[in-house]
Amino acid sequence: MKRKCVFFRVDSGNVLGFGHLNRCLILADEFKMENFEVHFICQNLEGNLIKNIRKCGFKIHQIRNSNDTITNDFQKTKQILEKFQDRISCLVIDNYRWNKKYEGKLRSMIKCIFIIDDLANRKHDCDILLDPNLYTNFEKRYEKLVSKKCMLLLGPKYILLRKEFFSCKKRKKIEKLKKIFISFGGQDCSNQSIKVLNGIHRSKLEFGEINVVVGKSNKFFKQLRKISKQIKNVKIFSDINNISCLM
């Protein structure tokens, strides 16, 4: 008997960054532990992290760049899903272009539609919606955007964290600042990491450790390497699996 499947529709790249994919990989690991066969549908965007999906052992279905229209994106995704529709238990969508119009068209073949969102700026046709961000009145942000039957997982208690964070020891109160952790996401498109390092450099303050985490495909990576040599105790990290140890 063939295993039941869970599909993820998510992208990564130089423009989108890596956060959408990384949080989906965390959720995918949980489905894998429950013996589901996990599939990812991804656009082949510039700077993508599809290789990371392969490393995790999940199945990948690449679709050509559909940046022209969401309609093309939907049609290509639907064609892939149709091949597995008798086995699909859940479709997880982490993509700001998708909305109620396209999600609803998959109702006939998908038992459970699971949306991961941050924006609360469009309606969804889904069974579960996850938004772990802490906003003012976060409990009410989606009241008019989903049906009353939808299970809402809202707020920081639902944040998707890698297992390494659950084994971290509770730390004592810090009396003096000795260690700085800098990360603005894998891509850091607006180059905030370098701005912070320049500020530290101008301040002439000294710290025991200054740890900067970025993705290797970050377009400012060489600049970061260069400035890190000018400031004492700065280390640049990328694509690491133990980020909690640096925090």
PLM feature spans:
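Donor-nucleotide binding loops and adjacent catalytic segments primarily
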Residues: 169-247
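A nucleotide-sugar donor-handling region in carbohydrate enzymes
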Residues: 125-191, 213-222
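Short, glycine-rich nucleotide/cofactor-binding loops
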Residues: 5-21, 183-190
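Residue-level preference for short coil/turn positions at secondary-structure junctions
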Residues: 1-2, 34, 87, 109, ...
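Conserved alpha-helical elements of sugar-nucleotide-dependent glycosyltransferases
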Residues: 19-26, 192-196
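Short gly/ser/thr-rich secondary-structure transition/capping motifs
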Residues: 110-117, 160-167, 235-238
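Active-site and donor-binding regions of nucleotide-sugar-utilizing enzymes
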Residues: 8-18, 25-30, 36, 42-57, ...
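Short, Lys/Arg-enriched, disordered terminal segments
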Residues: 1-5, 79-86, 202-209
